[in-house]
Amino acid sequence: MEKKVSHVIDFLSNDEVQRQLGDPSISGISFSFDIRTLLKKHSGGNPQFFNYSMRDSFHEWCADIELGANTNELVTELLWDIIYLTEHQFLLPYYHGEHKKFQKKLVKRVGNHLNSLVNNSASKPTGSMTVNVRHVWRNVGDRYTLLYLPLYFKELIWCKANGSIFHVIIPHTKEHVIHEHKEWLLAILEMAGYWNLSHVRLYLPRDDLTNIQTLLKNLHWIGANLLPNENRNECNENDDITLSDETYIILECEC
């Protein structure tokens, strides 16, 4: 687990990324890829780096960062690490020690999803995903995105998109910017808009009480709805009981 996190951080610490983060007009970076990039013959385009910069008096995401000449050999392992770490956000704490078992299941899920994409069919969902669109977080993502907004968050932001929904696992905010939710929320909405997604779902840690209270007070401004968590009693035999959204408060808003 720690090795995967270190691998991702090392990748984000390349000279070009650090140079751009030193530019005062840039307040964030992003790395994004279509899951079909994992296929030898893929049509998902290449992974992309973006910066969130001020242009013409407003911020926007721009693909202005080069991956670098020596990244091709490492990129497949990196993409798998990002997928693993994103999906791991929904692994219940009780099962955090079962990394190998979780990884084995995840590889199978990703493989099934890629096969369905190759066959030009929709990914076949499992379990409760077939009956309740609210819990599509269980689906493997069509696209995975890593956000780094250092002005607002202590940690990396793990994201994935499936269908028209952008799932964003929000880390704890920095205390001195707790009320600046408008700025980081706009950055996330604009990233979702870049990929033509219609909705953003924010997964807020239940123990980040100040951030949750601030956002709940501003539901009207952000046009968000509070979504219920998955009912574990309604999970069927196909659902992976090691996964859950119960550690999060979930807000959904339109892009």
From Swiss-Prot:
It comes from the Eukaryota. InterPro entries: Acyl_CoA_acyltransferase, ODC_AZ. GO terms for molecular function: ornithine decarboxylase inhibitor activity. It holds the Pfam family ODC_AZ. One of its GO terms (biological process) is viral translational frameshifting. Interacts with ODC and thereby sterically blocks ODC homodimerization. Belongs to the ODC antizyme family. Ornithine decarboxylase (ODC) antizyme protein that negatively regulates ODC activity and intracellular polyamine biosynthesis in response to increased intracellular polyamine levels. Binds to ODC monomers, inhibiting the assembly of the functional ODC homodimer, and targets the monomers for ubiquitin-independent proteolytic destruction by the 26S proteasome. This is Ornithine decarboxylase antizyme. It comes from Candida glabrata (strain ATCC 2001 / BCRC 20586 / JCM 3761 / NBRC 0622 / NRRL Y-65 / CBS 138). The lineage of its organism: Eukaryota, Fungi, Dikarya, Ascomycota, Saccharomycotina.
